[in-house]
């Protein structure tokens, strides 16, 4: 054993032992409790960041603790390898996305191995490999057969210069990110998955999940179940009588309708724009810019009057029709009723364009004014109808019932349940993704690729140039034969949304070599007992993976309908930011490692200079580590300098897993010092720690009993904290243990060996390398086996019992000292000890005790 702790040597030795033992390969065992813990698989961007380190360490700690407690544990890893960043990198570097992706995977895998993670690499999944995405294609075809997948036209962002479809994030201020051209909205045929068919089940099943309430609320709101009324405004055009249909949750305000707004893509808009250049120009303007709902929600609301009116369904009054840039064709009916008096968006729109505002609900004690919007204008809980004829005085529920009944009687509408959730459009007009297994035949139409011809393999040697889809230019991929009639045909060039790849990978981990999509091993491991990932995945990834599981269940592939029993959303890793701003307002961000900070006498930062030139930089505050703010810390540099165990210890100690973690160089130094202390104690006491002599706990001297009582008391708390995933307090417990062991005077070597062994096992899940090596070199492995499978230490309840207890001694209600008495001392004995104590004599000043109050186990108060 070396005197000095050298992390690189210790970690290399431990990892060598683990590789030789194939330590983390997991096998199904029906006779053992299983625990399947998964971190959301990373995108292979090139290097790990500290967010990865934190996520995977949390997973690893969980795995090791539960393995010590007898669970059959599994921690796999894979790569979410398709996606747009690879295409962008390929364009920038002139290499195929496949080459860039595989090189990144190789490097990041080495980084994970250097962290000492308990990953079963035999189950590794890479989503851009044909043996994985074959099953995306296979399930898509099954869904097509069942009607769960289907084709329809959908709206996309079209760059007219690059002649390509853009993702929402590639549209910046209405322009294409590469060409700078104004983006157009286009309708093209795309494939969809009928997730709305599962809307109620997706909502109801949230109740049974051990997920953060915040995530469940986000999914609940995204699904957005609404109870309302679907009805039509009658109109006549070109000799035909029709209805302009809308959906509303506020039918109680129908008498306040003063306009209707329709989407630019609405069929009525196109008809009304004939021979009206100004109206057509506005429609064209609306079709430019992104199609992202978030963008539309925040942009300026604009509208143009069409000069056409529909009839109010209950009064017959004319209602003017406008085209609004905020109305989405994909939501509801592509038309909305405008009630400016009681909808904030409509209120602003009406004020902007001078439209009538008609109050039709009132709240007692409130006064309505059209001068400015007030929150109560939209209140449906306290309001009653006014200015609404026969509906006056009705509260929300009664008004909706009555109005819906009248609309139904007139054949104009009825109550309806709707969802904010829309079917999942999976077609992407991109190269680097799962090919959609469809062949377009001039005679037969769209023909599914036969199952025996799967996978449709994506060529990996293409280099995108930003103009169009490379697959459409690849004759080798594009041209094929129709499997039905044998005619010359062409393949579908759209690829699948990458959320398809991440919707089921955890099921493939369970059976990575299966010749079917999944097998019996999947039902052994799934559902995941613990899933770990960022809050940013709360909606789309987690919702799609839940949908995918239910589809697989309904197809008879798996027995479960929810992929993850429990979810932990780890907090972000934050760091200081520093910048300089030029005359044009452009900020240049500097890495904290390149900056010297000065502090005031209270330790608060008051200034900073760049190390390279000594000139000031601005303090930008603490923000999430990111490339854009240049405030990241390279995990590899941290591992190279301090070792993986120090990195792991700091990330677990600095904050509870679900909270944000503020980076601290001093905290990293502190973690390193602690591990050196653990090693130094082992080295300094290596001979005493080698003593395996049994001992009778009851016969130990007081020093031994005191040490064991403290260690086993802290162990009890640490075990509880491990179970509730509070790893920061586990580390605190280990620090208390080391302090107690270092400070123990007179404890026998056997007691030191026992208590130091407890410390190593408590620390092991967090810092596996140094504890594994100490366990081995100090002889614990010879006695108990390698630390990998050493049992979790049991709390000795007898050690926690005390022969004496300490009571607070008060005189006339003021604390004057402490009193040690036998644990089972009688009230009379406690009273006698109190008046005999020197502190009582000092403060009583010769006065006799009038009354003695004893609070068992806590205090004794002598009144004089």
Curated annotation (Swiss-Prot):
SUPFAM superfamilies referenced in this protein's UniProt entry, alphabetically: Anticodon-binding domain of a subclass of class I aminoacyl-tRNA synthetases (SSF47323), Nucleotidylyl transferase (SSF52374), ValRS/IleRS/LeuRS editing domain (SSF50677)
Record GO biological process: leucyl-tRNA aminoacylation
Gene Ontology CC, one term: cytosol
Catalysis: reaction(s): tRNA(Leu) + L-leucine + ATP = L-leucyl-tRNA(Leu) + AMP + diphosphate
Location relative to the cell: Cytoplasm
UniProt motif 'HIGH' region: location: 42-52
GO molecular-function term, one example from the UniProt record: aminoacyl-tRNA deacylase activity
InterPro entries named in the record: aa-tRNA-synth_I_CS (IPR001412), aa-tRNA-synth_Ia (IPR002300), Leu-tRNA-ligase (IPR002302), Leu_tRNA-synth_edit (IPR025709), M/V/L/I-tRNA-synth_anticd-bd (IPR013155), Methionyl/Leucyl_tRNA_Synth (IPR015413), Rossmann-like_a/b/a_fold (IPR014729), tRNAsynth_Ia_anticodon-bd (IPR009080)
Name of the protein this chain belongs to: Leucine--tRNA ligase
Gene: leuS
Main location: cytoplasm
Residues that bind ATP: 627
EC number annotated for this UniProt entry: 6.1.1.4
Residues in coiled coil: none
Record flagged with keyword Kinase: no
Motif ('KMSKS' region): 624-628
Leading EC class: ligase
Record bears the keyword Aminoacyl-tRNA synthetase: yes
Keywords for the protein's UniProt record, in alphabetical order: Aminoacyl-tRNA synthetase, ATP-binding, Cytoplasm, Ligase, Nucleotide-binding, Protein biosynthesis
Record-stated family: Belongs to the class-I aminoacyl-tRNA synthetase family.
